[in-house]
Amino acid sequence: DLKDILASPEEPAAPIAVGRRSVTRAGEALDADSEKHVHHYPAADLLGKMMIPIIIDVQAKSVDELGGLVRHGGEEYLYVLRGSMELHSDLYAPLPLGPGDSVYFDSGMAHGYVRTSEEPCSVLAVCAGQGIQQLADTAAKRQRLSQEAELPE
């Protein structure tokens, strides 16, 4: 029936947020340490993001020190801010990267970042697609653990 086709759905669609933004001032990103790297999550206050930006201080100097490669759903863009590193994966030879270099890859491929410079290495990683909620949950867990470690006993 034409009336049924033109009728509004019974449940309204979820509203689409327009004009969202999140400002993260220098030094104010949500920080979460792991044994492998230090992660800084800008825009941590913005929920339901379509991508997750992460500034990573790459500390591991070998895949063994990383404890192996990781994989997660989605895609990842990596841009080296300072220092040098290698992107290791289960499909390609190690890829050397220096300041200003970038790579876009399927993060379902096992991967890991290894610092090759003596000086500190920092990268901007932007994760998008399937699996980013898992990354957000991991970030929240890392922050909780970091805060608990800082509490006096």
Give the residues covered by each predicted segment.
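A short, N-terminal "cap"/entry segment at the start of jelly-roll beta-barrel domains
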Residues: 1-52
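Conserved hydrophobic/aromatic beta-strand scaffold that supports enzyme active sites
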Residues: 39-41, 53-57, 77, 102-104
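A short beta-loop-beta micro-motif enriched in histidine and acidic residues
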Residues: 48-51, 63-77, 99
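A short hydrophobic beta-strand segment most commonly corresponding to one strand
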Residues: 50-56, 104, 118-133
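Short, conserved beta-strand element in jelly-roll/cupin
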Residues: 55-59, 70-87
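Short beta-strand His + acidic residue motifs that chelate non-heme Fe in jelly-roll/DSBH
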Residues: 87-88, 95, 111-117
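Short acidic-glycine-tyrosine-enriched beta hairpin
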Residues: 91-108
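Amphipathic alpha-helical interface segments
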Residues: 121-153
